[in-house]
Design a protein with these regions (language model features):
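A short loop-to-beta-strand scaffold at the N-terminal edge of the catalytic core in hydrolase folds
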Residues: 1-7
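Active-site loop/oxyanion-hole signature of alpha/beta-hydrolase fold enzymes
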Residues: 5, 37, 44-87
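Conserved HGGG/HGGXW glycine-rich cap/lid loop of the alpha/beta-hydrolase fold
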Residues: 7-52, 225
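Conserved catalytic-core motifs of eukaryotic protein kinase domains, centered on the activation segment
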Residues: 27-29, 53-60, 120-123, 220-221
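Conserved hydrolase catalytic core segment
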Residues: 80-121
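Helix-rich cap/lid subdomain of alpha/beta-hydrolase
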Residues: 118-177, 181, 188
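Active-site nucleophile elbow and catalytic-triad environment of alpha/beta-hydrolase enzymes
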Residues: 180-199
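Conserved loop-alpha-helix segment in the C-terminal half of the alpha/beta-hydrolase fold
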Residues: 204-229
Length: 229
């Protein structure tokens, strides 16, 4: 089961908010009211393994292809149209694949610290994150979000980011995500991501790239997105 928020469902103008690692739709708690006030319908799911969605205990249950399939099922179930996609971090790796499968359903795109890797390596920052995610004994999701935030979170906010992960058995999805990024040419989704880039090059709807300048994992990816889309 995939949990999602559906605010202002009567509106025909949809904003789809896809979160990344290791957060959940709580990430968008301050954005959603403003979008609703502007007359938008807001859909904000929790990816499988995160938030209030189901969580597999077996890390091997999580694959890039499975995440695309799980989120696509929700997308098809809701029968959304006229969508602006806001895709942050892993929300982009998943959301951009959904957009390129059905581009006519989207009216705009905002990419934030994300992209579609095609197996040509990773930044040193990402490699450090990958190593950390697999070796640290206490994978404290609230602390990770806190350390990556320019706005310092209070204790209640940190606790909210930790709430979906009461112990290590709930964190298989969060531990798995860094392993699933296509940073080598042997990854089984490289071909599909290359094909998705070809679709993105033809996407003519309004597109915006918003990247944090201190993000070491997606350094300079905003320039690539601006150039290609």
């Amino acid at each position: 089961r995939m949990h999602y928020l559906d605010e202002n469902p009567s509106s025909k103008d949809v904003v789809l908010l896809l979160h990344g690692e290791p957060s959940w739709c709580y990430l968008y708690r301050k954005i959603i009211p403003h979008l609703v006030e502007a007359g938008k319908r807001v859909i904000a799911p929790d990816l499988i393994g995160f938030g209030k969605s189901d969580k597999y205990k077996d890390k091997d249950a999580y694959t890039y292809a499975n995440h695309i399939d799980w989120t696509s099922q929700l997308f098809d179930h809701l029968q959304l149209d006229n969508i602006i996609l806001f895709a942050q971090d892993w929300g982009g790796l998943i959301g951009l694949r959904i957009l390129t499968a059905q581009p006519d359903k989207f009216s705009g795109l905002i990419v934030s610290n994300s992209g579609l890797p095609v197996g040509i390596g990773a930044t040193e920052g990402f490699n450090q994150w990958l190593n950390y995610s697999q070796t640290v004994e206490d994978f404290n999701c609230g602390k990770i979000v806190y350390q990556g935030s320019m706005k310092k979170l209070d204790e209640a906010e940190i606790a909210a980011y930790n709430a979906p992960f009461p112990d290590e058995t709930y964190k298989a999805g969060a531990r798995a995500f860094p392993l699933l990024v296509p940073i080598t040419d042997g990854h089984d989704q490289v071909k599909e991501n290359i094909e998705a880039w070809e679709v993105l090059k033809t996407f003519t709807k309004p597109t915006l790239a918003i990247f944090g300048e201190y993000d070491m994992s997606f350094r300079d990816q905003d320039k690539y997105i601006i150039e290609k889309i």
